[in-house]
Amino acid sequence: MDSLTDQVFYMNRYPTVGMVITSEGVVAIDGPMKPSDAIEWRDFIASKGPLRYHINTEHHQDHIASNWYLGGGTIISSEVTYSDFLTSLPSVEVAKERMLFYDPECGPLLDGYEIRWPDITFRRRMTLRLGGQTFHLIFSPGHTRGQTVVHAVEARVVFTADNITPGNYPFFHSAAVWEWFESLALLESLDVDWYVPGHGGPCRKDEIPRQRQRMFDVIGEVKKLKDLGLGREEVQERVNYIDRPGLEHPRVLGDRAYLLQKNGVGIVYDALGEHPSGQAG
């Protein structure tokens, strides 16, 4: 485990997860996908205090599979994340199969495993006050259409989930493409010292322009091919950015990373036919 302050801790696994200690218990943001990591994270949380709230920032399996392992604590997500839960974990069987792939020695840890859903949902914004700490949960579509960022005000840190991924290529397979840029602008406006991303280590505000540029690079490549008259499937086959030098992608995903990239290129292709302000009406 690593710390940013005496009250803020994070674990840079898959994904990067975080927690804030208050005088009345712990607020955790996401949890590790591997069962062995999730149990390690659970035990660390317990060493700091009771888990009071557990926030799911998105519906992707790497962020929600640990809900069952962490136990206790009220789980909170956006309404959209709640509605998309089964698109990532369609069944307990699929969840177990993927966890065994990512964590081959975890078999005994899967006994009794269940998909644990959020207990409370919110639409645009929610504020938690616990033990002298204030947490603003802000609906911030981007990497997924239901994304949440968590602004821990007094701790001067924001947990961005996959809206920021330092050193990693962006994935668009569940993205709200144009809203993602709006969410980055919101993150830039916050008065914080640290940004804890969904993948990679904590960063400063100067990471946000780099994230924005990485997204522009992918979108620009797709646009160039689309403008040449190439169809959606052809563009999906031709755009392969995650193997290029300079940045990383999650190797733990194996070949699935290429499927996610392909699906994301399709999402970008479709978004280029939309007006960023949305549909008229």
Describe each region flagged by the PLM.
Residues 21, 67-72, 130, 151:
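Short loop/helix-cap segments at secondary-structure boundaries that form the rim of catalytic
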Residues 7, 20, 30, 45, ...:
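Divalent metal-coordination and catalytic microenvironments
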Residues 1-5, 105-110, 129-134:
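Short Pro/Gly-enriched beta-strand edge/turn motifs at strand-loop
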Residues 23-24, 47-50, 70-74, 154-155, ...:
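Short glycine/proline-enriched coil/turn segments at helix->beta-strand junctions
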Residues 26-27, 33-35, 127, 134-218, ...:
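Metallo-beta-lactamase
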